[in-house]
């Protein structure tokens, strides 16, 4: 049950959540807003309250007492470390367990202890059999009866151990699955609560890496590995107890190995912890790069930036790889040293035991074997579980990082129930002397004493240059951020005193870059208001001019729109976002460039709807297209964070100030044909202007003629020679695409396929395998030495001859220890190099091939970026199991098994046959189980939506918070993760069967080999010495099977992961190889020739139905038309994100599918509708895909894009970090950087898809002038809904319903008074 005082528990039963113990109280207005500076407020804050200034890492350093205790408890990992957070304790890993989980943990622990305690019985029973062999005549019935008693004990223990091991594995795996589900839920829940300032400092890629990589490390640490660890420690303690029971002197002597072993393990843990933390940092940064690149893959492709992004990704992975290799070194060094000390003490124990036997303190040699074998088994298994200890250490370090996020309670907490909820909202908004700077950019002040009053029911428009603080003001009103000084109030109440959820429900916002989610249109609208009916949805969609296009979708309102709304155009997305806001019926409406992506007709309809929706409510608008705000009650002009002009449209125009300059910048050319027939001669121009105008008219006429020729071609196209050529070309390309699609099935990968991809590492693998095989000869060597020792105890009386044999045994055991030390060190380092190289190669190859895929690949919901990022984060590390320390254990085991089988055949072939048969039987069972688990893994991955949803949440958390739907998305994540949880539990059952069989296998092996061996000795077929050597050999072979089988789940997972990655690595894009094709000189003539096209995900909904238009070299062609008419698709096809499905698209007369895609894109430059920047400096973003660009050229491009003015105000200039996705820049600033990125390439074809939509009028005019200069001598295709920016185009093409409806220049189309004319009249700002 949830705690009574926890109304927002969300099903989390753990009352230790600080955020549920207390909540942030309403904070009164302060001149300088630091809650901790006011003692009254500070006393009410949660213990783990933080603000953005508190997020700097606070280094943890253990005290002297802690260091001593850490070393004493084998926790040297934190004995001398300075870490950002203290690694959590082992119990702390289960802090989110519930009562049932603790019950499972208790039962599993009991079973693990029972299983561990039972292991020394093996030594005890073996000792009793040894006594029977040495004391009684081998052919006597007394020998046979005594020996057979122990056989039945082996059988009974084997059955008992198999049951306890099954229960142990199931309990730990079930508990782990449930605890990890809770931990993931809490992590996502906590991410949803964090404030905007935290996200400015914590990139979404790093958060995603935590969710995938760090969580996986914790899962590995608290699952079956913990059971194995507990079993190992129980085995060690039980072994010590048994040894002390039989002979305390010998046991005490052998216990001397403990301090040295503890020191080894502590030093190992210390080194592993520090290197793991450094490794995680590199992996996290690489994850951020991968996430950004895949989320903005079209931008990366358009600028041929694939290899640059791959280079950045690889560089960060390389940093982590170096530390991972060091982990292999330390593991091998200290692990080998452990075994050296163990075997040295083992030899000394045999020597001392022989001495005690000689002097009569020990009466039978079997007791020596019991004590020595007990201590050996305990210590040996402790050494073998050292890799599991490293896994546990990794889990503790990762958990510390995860818990920091989970425990963080921000000052602006969307889950807080505190704060006022005003009953009768009037809607008076006031900004009073507001100062603000972003937490991540303390050196740049955005608002500098803003004073603004918005009276109830009025509309106020904010205008000004990009980056002047307009959107920041909106962020302060919605409490994404808080001012550093001053107050923001609603109806006289400081927004900091209001309940956040109530505030954001009261204030509805349409953001500059609309965010939609990977769901149906219906569900996206429900996010706005979960209680809405379909009738209400249809009503608001009609208001937002969205209903008509939605009805034309394949499933109407139930159509899936893909990741980020990829199936919709920019204008369609914005209309759905507007409808989603209107359905909330907010009291205060914030419109941040709400209609920037709409065509003029849609904008007029939607603006009218917004004007109607604004009636009776306070509305704050931000718009660069001034026609949308001319009806506002008040227009305020921002500059440098303060208001410099205010008034309505007419007042500000009469004032003739800055606003008037913006209006003039957006006025259209005078239209002399508005009331009379058009005559070119009557236009009064000077000679120069007339010459220029005639040139423009000639160009326009050529374009119009081309359009008319295109229309006539449409009528008789099927019979033309060019049509036949286009059809033949399409048939060839269609056949190629069909072949690619046929190859795009599921690729099944085997272990050999993984090794085939290890080119360049074969020498390391060979040498590593050689050393691993040498390391694997340890158990056969021990079998021979034990057989040799057994013979020594037959030297009766026990005297000098026996002691000499034991002295030689000391040397033999120490020699094996030295061999193990050096072979383990060498093999561990070599395989660490191979595993990290291979994992990095798979990551890089997968990432590289993803960046080269065509757009249709990403349109497929199965290939949503969220899912692909999860695959990159988890599959490549999973493959490492085949080539890292786990593979070493298997090689050790294989070498030991083969060598022990050989020894058994040499000394007793009957035992050899029996043991080999048992091992093969177990192998067949394991293969069957592996196949079953592999199928379950594939099914689980294919059905896993939880990872995609989590990434969608992380990417769009600010939007989710503003919509007050944190809990809705959290519920969605919880629901989707239940399927994953069920799959894990089913898979755990199969893995538990495997674990049970392999861990009890040694007892069954001993049972059957001793049963047959006793019979052989009794019948006199073999001597007891040879039979004993054969049995010991097979026993140690069974130990090898048991040791290696625990890695069985990881190997199955590696095979599944390899198949998933190979599907990515070997997939060929439909657009073909980037470098193949012709590379002619591009002049810039473009022809859309009867082009037909449908998106692959919507084949029955054609976008182009015989589209025909031409752009001649050096022309500027503007594409206009309703949102969703296919304008951006035209540009996407020129960039070859998609290929035509009918007709042909030609550049300079050649089908672009025959051109090298790399060459084609080097001749083009694209400025997209939603400019995508990447983490890094402004310089790096401008030069994306280019090498060695001179600084002068970069500055020239930035100046052309009108970016130099705001750059001058940045302390680091062009070396300023723009933040993740350019988050540190305003929308207009981002767009200017994107324009500079295009201009620096000096392209032959310039593609501008709403290139100036986020710019203020003055910046737009300056940038437009720059673009006008930049397009001289090159072909320019531009899309713009702000028609003032395209009126000087040589040709304007109006596209609707998949065809060209009108074409001509501005004057010609105005003369026609058709569709274009109507759009112009809607945006006319004539004064």
From Swiss-Prot:
Topology, Extracellular side: 126-151, 247, 353-364, 790-805, 908-910, 1018-1030
InterPro entries reported for this sequence: AAA+_ATPase, ABC1_TM_dom, ABC1_TM_sf, ABC_transporter-like_ATP-bd, ABC_transporter-like_CS, P-loop_NTPase, Type_1_exporter
Annotated Pfam families: ABC_membrane, ABC_tran
Biased composition (Acidic residues): 673-686
Locations listed in the record: Apical cell membrane
Gene Ontology cellular-component terms listed: apical plasma membrane; membrane
Membrane topology: Multi-pass membrane protein
PROSITE patterns: ABC_TM1F (PS50929), ABC_TRANSPORTER_1 (PS00211), ABC_TRANSPORTER_2 (PS50893)
UniProt GO MF annotations: ABC-type transporter activity; ATP binding; ATP hydrolysis activity; ATPase-coupled transmembrane transporter activity
Primary subcellular site in the record, as a coarse category: membrane
TM helices/strands, residue ranges: 105-125, 152-172, 226-246, 248-268, 332-352, 365-385, 767-789, 806-826, 887-907, 911-931, 997-1017, 1031-1051
Keyword list, A-Z: ATP-binding, Cell membrane, Membrane, Nucleotide-binding, Repeat, Translocase, Transmembrane, Transmembrane helix
Domain ABC transporter: 429-665, 1086-1322
Biased composition range(s): Basic and acidic residues: 1-17
Biased composition (Polar residues): 711-721
Positions with a binding annotation for ATP: 464-471, 1121-1128
Cytoplasmic side: 1-104, 173-225, 269-331, 386-766, 827-886, 932-996, 1052-1327
EC number: 7.6.-.-
Tissue: Expressed in pharyngeal epithelial cells that surround the anterior pharyngeal cuticle. Shares same expression pattern as sms-5.
Record's compositionally biased regions (Low complexity): 694-704
Domain ABC transmembrane type-1 intervals: 106-394, 766-1053
Residue span of region Disordered: 1-23, 671-721
Family, per entry: Belongs to the ABC transporter superfamily. ABCB family. Multidrug resistance exporter (TC 3.A.1.201) subfamily.
Protein function: Contributes to the establishment of a polar lipid barrier to block small molecule passage into the pharyngeal cuticle. Probably exports polar lipids into the developing pharyngeal cuticle to protect against xenobiotic insult. Likely functions in the same pathway as sphingomyelin synthase sms-5.
Protein name stated in the entry: P-glycoprotein 14
């Amino acid at each position: 049950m949830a705690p009574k005082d926890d109304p927002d528990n969300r099903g989390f039963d753990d009352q230790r959540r600080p955020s549920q113990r207390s909540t942030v109280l309403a904070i009164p207005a302060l001149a300088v807003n630091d809650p901790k500076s006011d003692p009254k407020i500070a006393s009410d804050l949660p213990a783990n309250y933080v603000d953005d200034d508190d997020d700097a890492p606070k280094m943890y350093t253990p005290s002297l007492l802690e260091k001593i205790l850490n070393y004493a408890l084998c926790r040297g990992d934190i004995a001398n470390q300075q870490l950002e957070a203290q690694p959590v304790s082992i119990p702390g890993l289960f802090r989110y367990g519930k009562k049932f989980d603790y019950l499972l943990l208790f039962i599993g622990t009991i079973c693990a202890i029972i299983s561990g305690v039972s292991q020394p019985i093996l030594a005890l029973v073996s000792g009793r059999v040894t006594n029977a062999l040495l004391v009684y005549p081998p052919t006597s019935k007394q020998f046979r009866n005594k020996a057979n008693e122990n056989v039945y004990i082996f059988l009974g223990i084997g059955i008992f151990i198999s049951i306890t091991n099954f229960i142990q594995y199931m309990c730990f795996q079930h508990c782990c699955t449930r605890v990890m589900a809770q931990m993931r839920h809490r992590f996502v829940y906590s991410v949803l609560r964090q404030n905007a300032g935290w996200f400015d400092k914590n990139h979404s890629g790093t958060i995603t890496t935590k969710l995938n990589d760090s969580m996986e490390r914790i899962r590995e640490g608290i699952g079956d590995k913990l059971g194995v660890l507990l079993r190992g420690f129980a085995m060690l303690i039980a072994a010590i107890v048994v040894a002390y029971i039989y002979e305390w002197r010998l046991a005490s002597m052998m216990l001397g190995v403990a301090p040295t072993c503890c020191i080894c393990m502590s030093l190992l843990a210390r080194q592993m912890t520090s290197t793991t933390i450094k490794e995680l940092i590199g992996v996290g940064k690489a994850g951020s790069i991968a996430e950004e690149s895949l989320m903005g893959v079209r931008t990366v492709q358009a600028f041929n930036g694939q290899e640059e992004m791959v280079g950045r990704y690889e560089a960060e992975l390389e940093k982590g790889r170096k530390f991972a290799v060091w982990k292999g070194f330390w593991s091998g060094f200290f692990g080998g040293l452990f075994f050296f000390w163990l075997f040295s003490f083992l030899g000394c124990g045999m020597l001392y035991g022989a001495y005690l036997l000689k002097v009569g303190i020990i009466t039978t040699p079997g007791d020596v074997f019991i004590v020595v074998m007990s201590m050996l088994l305990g210590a040996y298994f402790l050494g073998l579980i050292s890799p599991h200890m490293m896994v546990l250490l990794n889990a503790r370090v990762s958990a510390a990082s995860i818990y920091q996020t989970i425990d963080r309670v921000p000052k602006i907490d969307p889950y807080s129930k505190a704060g006022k909820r005003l009953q009768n909202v009037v809607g008076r908004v006031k900004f009073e002397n507001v100062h603000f700077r972003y937490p991540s950019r303390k050196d740049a002040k955005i608002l500098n004493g803003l004073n603004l009053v918005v009276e109830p029911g009025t509309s106020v428009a904010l205008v000004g240059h990009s980056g002047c603080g307009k959107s920041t003001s909106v962020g302060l009103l919605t409490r994404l951020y808080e001012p550093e000084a001053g107050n923001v109030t609603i109806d006289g109440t400081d927004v900091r005193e209001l309940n956040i959820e109530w505030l954001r429900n009261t204030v509805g916002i349409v953001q500059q870059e609309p965010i939609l989610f990977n769901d149906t249109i219906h569900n996206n609208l429900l996010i706005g208001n979960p209680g809405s009916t379909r009738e209400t949805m249809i009503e608001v969609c009609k208001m937002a001019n969205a209903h008509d296009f939605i009805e034309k979708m394949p499933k109407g309102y139930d159509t899936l729109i893909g990741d980020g709304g990829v199936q919709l155009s920019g204008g369609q997305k914005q209309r759905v976002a507007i409808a989603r806001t209107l359905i909330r019926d907010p009291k205060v409406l914030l419109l941040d460039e709400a209609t920037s992506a709409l065509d003029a007709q849609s904008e007029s309809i939607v603006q009218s709807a917004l004007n109607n929706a604004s009636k009776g409510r306070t509305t704050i608008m931000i718009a660069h297209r001034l026609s949308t705000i001319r009806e506002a009650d008040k227009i305020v002009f921002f500059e440098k964070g303060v208001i410099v002009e205010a008034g309505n449209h007419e007042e500000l125009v009469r004032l003739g100030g800055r606003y008037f300059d913006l209006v003039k910048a957006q006025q259209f050319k005078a239209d002399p044909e508005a009331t009379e027939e058009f005559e070119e001669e009557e236009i009064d121009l000077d000679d120069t202007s007339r010459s220029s105008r005639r040139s423009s008219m000639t160009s326009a006429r050529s374009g119009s003629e081309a359009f008319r020729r295109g229309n006539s071609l449409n009528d008789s196209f099927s019979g033309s020679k060019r049509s036949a050529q286009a059809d033949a070309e399409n048939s060839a390309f269609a056949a190629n695409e069909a072949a690619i699609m046929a190859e795009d099935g599921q690729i099944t990968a085997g272990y050999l396929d993984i090794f085939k991809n290890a080119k360049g590492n074969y020498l390391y693998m060979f040498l590593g395998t050689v050393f691993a095989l040498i390391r694997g000869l340890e158990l056969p060597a021990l079998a021979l030495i034990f057989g040799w020792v057994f013979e020594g105890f037959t030297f009766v009386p026990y005297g000098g001859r026996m002691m000499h044999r034991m002295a030689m045994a000391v040397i033999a055991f120490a020699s094996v220890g030295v061999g193990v030390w050096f072979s383990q060190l060498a093999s561990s380092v070599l395989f660490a190099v191979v595993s990290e190289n291979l994992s990095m190669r798979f990551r890089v190859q997968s990432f590289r091939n993803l960046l080269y895929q065509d757009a249709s690949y990403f349109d497929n919901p199965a290939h949503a970026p969220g899912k692909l990022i999860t695959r990159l984060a988890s599959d490549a590390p999973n493959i490492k199991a085949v080539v890292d320390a786990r593979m070493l254990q298997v090689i050790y085991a294989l070498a030991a098994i083969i060598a022990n089988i050989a020894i058994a055949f040499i000394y007793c072939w009957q035992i050899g046959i029996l043991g080999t048969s048992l091992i093969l039987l177990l192998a067949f069972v394991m293969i069957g189980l592996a196949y079953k688990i592999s199928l379950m893994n594939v099914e689980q991955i294919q059905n896993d939506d939880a990872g995609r949803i989590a990434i969608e949440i992380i990417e769009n958390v600010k939007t989710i918070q503003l919509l007050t739907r944190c809990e809705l998305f959290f519920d969605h994540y919880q629901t989707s993760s239940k399927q994953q949880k069920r799959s894990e539990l089913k898979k755990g059952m199969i893995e538990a069967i495997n674990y049970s069989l392999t861990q009890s296998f040694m007892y069954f092996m001993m049972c059957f080999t001793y049963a047959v061996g006793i019979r052989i000795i009794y019948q006199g077929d073999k001597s007891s010495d040879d039979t004993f050597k054969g049995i010991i050999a097979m026993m140690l072979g069974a130990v090898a099977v048991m040791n290696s089988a625990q890695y069985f789940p990881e190997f199955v997972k590696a095979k599944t992961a390899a198949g998933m990655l190979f599907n990515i690595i070997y997939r060929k894009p439909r657009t073909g190889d980037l470098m193949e094709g012709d590379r002619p000189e591009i002049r810039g003539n473009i022809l859309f020739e009867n082009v037909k096209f449908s998106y692959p995900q919507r084949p029955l909904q054609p976008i182009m139905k015989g589209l025909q238009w031409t752009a001649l070299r050096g022309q500027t062609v503007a594409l206009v038309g309703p949102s969703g008419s296919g304008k951006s698709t035209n540009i996407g096809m020129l960039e070859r994100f998609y290929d035509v499905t009918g007709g042909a698209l030609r550049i300079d007369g050649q089908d672009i599918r025959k051109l090298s895609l790399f060459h084609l894109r080097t001749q083009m430059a694209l400025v997209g509708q939603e400019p995508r920047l990447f983490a890094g400096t402004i310089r790096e973003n401008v030069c994306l895909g280019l090498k060695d660009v001179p600084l002068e050229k970069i500055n020239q491009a930035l100046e052309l894009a009108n970016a130099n003015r705001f750059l001058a105000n940045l302390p680091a200039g062009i070396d300023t970090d723009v933040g993740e996705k350019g988050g540190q820049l305003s929308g207009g600033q981002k767009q200017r950087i994107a324009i500079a990125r295009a201009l620096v390439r000096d392209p032959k074809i310039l593609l501008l898809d709403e290139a100036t939509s986020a710019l203020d009028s003055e910046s737009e005019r300056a940038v437009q002038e720059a673009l006008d200069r930049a397009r001289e001598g090159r072909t320019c295709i531009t899309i713009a809904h702000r028609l003032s920016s395209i009126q000087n185009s040589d040709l304007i093409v109006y596209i609707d319903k998949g065809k060209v409806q009108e074409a001509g220049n501005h004057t010609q189309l105005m003369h026609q008074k058709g569709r274009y004319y109507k759009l112009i009249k809607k945006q006319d700002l004539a004064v």
